[in-house]
């Protein structure tokens, strides 16, 4: 009996974002869950300075060698006068059937890698260039959500150009007394601050500007419940059961420390028991947002539910984490899809979307041409 050819997957992780180490954790978990009888996997670590390491070098890091040491040994092998040097190891990879990006934050979620895969004419897991870019920018996301009448929080955008006009008094009048400050193009709660007075606002804004030149200042929902929904699919996506995150009362929100440093005080309710109508509303809002943004493959949709039961869509993550405490895979597990089966479906969805896009003709043929 002839052995079926394995699918050759190129997995990229790391990157030059503040979520570099988070990405490495996600990649380990995905790799461990993949069926090695079905997949041949090449690993590509993107270093903190944006260089793609070879599979051999990446596996050294994957197996526990200090990343800085491996990078120091590999860099002299690259001819940095070559404009393609940062991605040289990727272009040399042979017979990759599909790319699986596990790069959180910029490069991975902002459409950059997706554009590279498109240039390479290769299938890939997840959303396309435009959908990734629009979803990564919280301002653009909220504009699209608002256009489609999907409830989200009030906000203003602060930039270096209008910073002097965006005083705390102005924001109190236009947004509210209690504020959340967020870099527009970051994830995993990087650079996010809650502000309830002018000094907290000024300090939070100064820190947020370290991570982006466009800052969202949003209204803060009083005592919200943080609820998440996982989406899976392409043109006909499906929504998972919902999960809730309960943070310690001493913390004001589910921040980077809660997520990745010390999660000991955080509890999860999976699935969460909410009124049936609220559950359906959140699931439908998640699906509506997924479609409005043109997403493909997967997304985790985060909500804040107010004390009176109103859901506000907070963020959409197009390459959600797969760490040990990440809710995207956990919600599918409680919805009946195992970790390994979930990865299988994501890879197949990548192939399906590539085929769909391949059917589009970009060459122009005149109507009267023979």
Curated annotation (Swiss-Prot):
Subcellular location(s) per record: Cytoplasm
Swiss-Prot/TrEMBL catalytic activity: 2 D-alanine + ATP = D-alanyl-D-alanine + ADP + phosphate + H(+)
PROSITE patterns, alphabetized: ATP_GRASP, DALA_DALA_LIGASE_1, DALA_DALA_LIGASE_2
Organism superkingdom: Bacteria
Stored Pfam families: Dala_Dala_lig_C, Dala_Dala_lig_N
InterPro entries: ATP-grasp, ATP_grasp_subdomain_1, D-Ala_lig_Van_CS, D_ala_D_ala, Dala_Dala_lig_C, Dala_Dala_lig_N, PreATP-grasp_dom_sf
Binding of ATP, residues: 172-227
One of the record's GO molecular function terms: ATP binding
Binding site for Mg(2+) 1: 302, 315
Cofactor note: Binds 2 magnesium or manganese ions per subunit.
Keywords in alphabetical order: ATP-binding, Cell shape, Cell wall biogenesis/degradation, Cytoplasm, Ligase, Magnesium, Manganese, Metal-binding, Nucleotide-binding, Peptidoglycan synthesis
EC number: 6.3.2.4
Cofactor requirements of the protein: Mg(2+); Mn(2+)
Domain ATP-grasp: 142-348
GO biological process, one term: cell wall organization
Residues holding Mg(2+) 2: 315, 317
Function: Cell wall formation.
Protein family: Belongs to the D-alanine--D-alanine ligase family.
PANTHER family, sorted: D-ALANINE--D-ALANINE LIGASE, D-ALANINE--D-ALANINE LIGASE A
Protein name per UniProt: D-alanine--D-alanine ligase
Chain's gene name: ddl
């Amino acid at each position: 009996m002839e052995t079926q050819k394995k699918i050759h997957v190129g997995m990229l992780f790391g990157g030059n974002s503040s979520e570099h180490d988070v990405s490495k954790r996600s990649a380990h978990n995905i790799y461990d869950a993949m069926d090695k009888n079905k997949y041949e996997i090449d690993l590509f670590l993107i270093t903190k300075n944006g260089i793609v390491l070879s599979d051999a070098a990446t596996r050294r890091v994957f197996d526990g060698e200090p990343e800085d040491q491996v990078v120091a040994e590999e860099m002299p092998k690259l001819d940095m006068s070559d404009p393609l040097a940062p991605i040289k190891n990727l272009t040399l990879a042979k017979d990759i059937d599909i790319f699986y990006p596990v790069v959180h934050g910029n490069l991975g979620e902002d459409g950059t890698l997706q554009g590279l895969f498109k240039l390479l004419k290769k299938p890939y897991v997840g959303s396309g260039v435009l959908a990734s870019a629009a979803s990564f920018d919280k301002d653009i996301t909220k504009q699209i959500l608002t256009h489609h009448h999907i409830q989200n929080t009030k906000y203003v955008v602060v930039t270096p150009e209008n910073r002097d006009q965006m005083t705390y008094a102005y924001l109190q009048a236009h947004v509210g007394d209690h504020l959340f400050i967020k870099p527009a193009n970051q994830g995993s709660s990087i650079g996010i601050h809650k502000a309830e007075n002018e000094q907290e606002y000024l300090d939070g804004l100064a820190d947020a500007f370290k991570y982006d030149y466009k800052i969202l200042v949003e209204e803060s929902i009083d005592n919200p419940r943080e609820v998440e929904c996982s989406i899976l699919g392409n043109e006909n996506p499906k929504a998972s059961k919902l999960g809730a995150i309960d943070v310690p009362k001493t913390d004001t929100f589910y921040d980077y420390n809660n997520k990745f440093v010390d999660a000991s005080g955080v509890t999860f309710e999976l699935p969460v028991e909410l009124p049936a109508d609220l559950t359906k509303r959140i699931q439908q809002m998640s699906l509506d947002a997924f479609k409005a943004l043109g997403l493909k493959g997967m997304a985790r949709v985060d909500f804040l539910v107010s004390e009176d039961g109103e859901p506000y869509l907070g963020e959409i993550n197009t390459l959600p984490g797969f760490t040990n405490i990440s809710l995207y895979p956990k919600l599918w597990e409680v919805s009946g899809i195992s970790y390994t089966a979930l990865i299988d479906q994501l890879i197949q969805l990548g192939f399906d979307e590539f085929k769909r896009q391949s059917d589009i003709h970009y060459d122009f043929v005149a109507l009267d041409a023979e």
